[in-house]
């Protein structure tokens, strides 16, 4: 059920004590782990003094030293997506080598939350920001049970529920708009993370997300489109993982869809698609996972910048994530390489019951 909480310790253990075993058992490598650490170092070095990250890389000590800045204005979206890789590797505001970095980022998000009658508005004008930032708060709360995070996380979840399209069940840039699958996916991720952390999530909100997925599916639920059933590989990967978040029972359709997406191998430029597809294939223990993962893992490691001020970062020729620039691409690449142990909370076995 949407409101059922898993034992946080069992859900997040892979990020800390179980990390090495998870890397060995699920398809990571010493090279992917080293790549994660380089990526986290680059992210830490590009945090602004106020605790935020910016897609345009302003406010940090970069001084224009990195190419390919992003254009999205929401600082809560950029701060949220930069925090997620630290949390994914077990770093919180109370534990880990990057705890000061994480503490400043979480404090920035909490300070940016704007109280409204509908809940805590954290989006800075876009539901992308709301979903990503709420996911970071919910994950940090689940990992630490820090009461200081409970209030902001609860308020942000309440805003997400209120912002859902009451007719078709999705989310888009502004509250109440007919949904698209990319914005919807971030809200669903935040909702599932909060639910497994024990925070209240209305079951009707999760049900509504399932209704949205019904509207954008095609080919018997194996493919998914952006706002309608016209599918692309990227939107299909997102939709299939969202089906797993919402507890869809047609696992045969999910597995067929994943097989179709995995068959050509990972597109070396499609980091957004591969970020979602890696999670779905591993979560399903899909037969295509070992071969697909080996290629995806090694090509991401090989694509990481190794020299100069950009060392540790990534930039892909991916039109689906171009507005996020180097910051978003680096965060997504690190998150994808953390998939072997980043089981909390939405990716764990309890998350898709």
Per-region residue spans from a language model:
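Patatin-like phospholipase
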Residues: 106-109
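Short, solvent-exposed mixed-charge patches
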Residues: 351-353
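An alpha-helical repeat/solenoid feature that recognizes helix-turn-helix modules
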Residues: 2-41, 45, 55-101, 114-158, ...
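Acidic carboxylate motifs that coordinate Ca2+ or other divalent cations, activating on Asp/Glu
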Residues: 50
């Amino acid at each position: 059920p949407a409101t059922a909480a898993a034992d946080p310790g069992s859900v997040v253990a892979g990020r800390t004590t179980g990390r090495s075993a998870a890397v060995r058992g699920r398809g990571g490598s010493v090279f992917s782990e080293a790549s994660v650490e380089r990526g986290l170092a680059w992210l830490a070095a590009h945090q602004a003094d106020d605790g935020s990250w910016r897609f345009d890389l302003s406010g940090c000590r970069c001084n224009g030293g990195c190419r390919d800045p992003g254009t999205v204005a929401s600082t809560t979206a950029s701060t949220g997506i930069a925090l997620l890789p630290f949390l994914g590797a077990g770093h919180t505001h109370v534990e880990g080598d990057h705890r000061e970095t994480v503490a400043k980022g979480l404090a920035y998000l909490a300070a940016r939350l704007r109280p409204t009658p509908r809940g805590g508005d954290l989006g800075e004008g876009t539901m992308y920001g709301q979903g990503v930032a709420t996911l970071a708060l919910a994950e940090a709360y689940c990992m630490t049970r820090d009461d200081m995070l409970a209030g902001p996380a609860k308020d942000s979840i309440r805003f997400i529920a209120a912002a859902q399209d009451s007719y078709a069940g999705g989310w888009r840039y502004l509250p109440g708009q007919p949904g698209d699958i990319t914005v919807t996916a971030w809200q669903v991720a935040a909702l599932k993370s909060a639910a497994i952390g024990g925070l209240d999530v209305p079951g009707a909100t999760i049900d509504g997300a399932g209704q949205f997925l019904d509207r954008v599916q095609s080919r018997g639920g194996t493919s998914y489109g952006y706002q309608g059933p016209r599918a692309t590989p990227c939107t299909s990967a997102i939709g299939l993982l969202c089906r797993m978040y919402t507890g869809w029972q047609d696992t045969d359709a999910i597995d067929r869809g994943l097989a179709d997406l995995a068959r050509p191998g990972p597109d070396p430029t499609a980091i957004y698609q591969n970020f979602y597809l890696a999670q779905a294939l591993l979560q399903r223990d899909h037969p295509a996972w070992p071969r697909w993962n080996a290629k995806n893992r090694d090509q991401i490691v090989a694509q990481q910048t190794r020299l100069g001020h950009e060392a540790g970062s990534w930039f892909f020729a991916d039109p689906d994530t171009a507005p996020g620039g180097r910051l978003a691409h680096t965060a997504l690449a690190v998150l994808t390489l953390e998939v072997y142990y980043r089981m909390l909370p939405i990716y764990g076995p309890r998350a898709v019951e």
